[in-house]
Amino acid sequence: MSEAQGFDALASLSSNPEAAAPAVQKIDAQGRAYATGKRKNAIARVWIKPGKGSITINGRDQEVYFARPVLRMMIAQPLQVTDREGQFDIVVTVEGSGLSGQAGAVRHGLSKALTYYEPGLRAALKPHGFLTRDSRVVERKKYGKAKARRSFQFSKR
């Protein structure tokens, strides 16, 4: 085999990573798919299984835990994109950060759990960015500054 053929084979492998890894369901003994999602300092652990569509977050219903409709809409986005609303019972434990960060973490975890349960859904979720970890976190405070970037008030005289 010549060098050119070897490089062509390597190029085809690296350009299409999805072809190298076959899609396999990741389901536990109870028939659930599990995934973790993260956003800011929030970490969500998500379990999904076929059911009537109930969403339980930290032992409470989603309407109670996330009172703002915008946050509930954020969580439902992966289900709407994949047309799986009302088909899965979802149990979530989430901690850290605020409500907005927690909702983002739940959305990330739910998207990953859906792809573990049905690997074919990855193509629908990936373009919307639901499988990508949002790496933006709060910038740290620096010494000699009031906040991360804000300086103390300057007095000329």
From Swiss-Prot:
Origin superkingdom: Bacteria
Stored InterPro entries: Ribosomal_Su5_D2-typ_SF, Ribosomal_uS9, Ribosomal_uS9_bac/plastid, Ribsml_uS5_D2-typ_fold_subgr
SUPFAM superfamilies: Ribosomal protein S5 domain 2-like
GO molecular function annotation: RNA binding; structural constituent of ribosome
UniProt keyword annotation of Ribosomal protein present: yes
Keyword tags: Ribonucleoprotein, Ribosomal protein
Any one GO BP annotation for this protein: translation
GO cellular component: cytosolic small ribosomal subunit
Cleaved signal peptide residues: none
HAMAP family listed in its UniProt record: Ribosomal_uS9_B (MF_00532_B)
Family label: Belongs to the universal ribosomal protein uS9 family.
PANTHER family: RIBOSOMAL PROTEIN S9 (PTHR21569), SMALL RIBOSOMAL SUBUNIT PROTEIN US9M (PTHR21569:SF1)
Name listed for the protein in its UniProt record: Small ribosomal subunit protein uS9
Lineage of the species this protein comes from: Bacteria, Pseudomonadati, Pseudomonadota, Alphaproteobacteria, Caulobacterales
Originating gene: rpsI
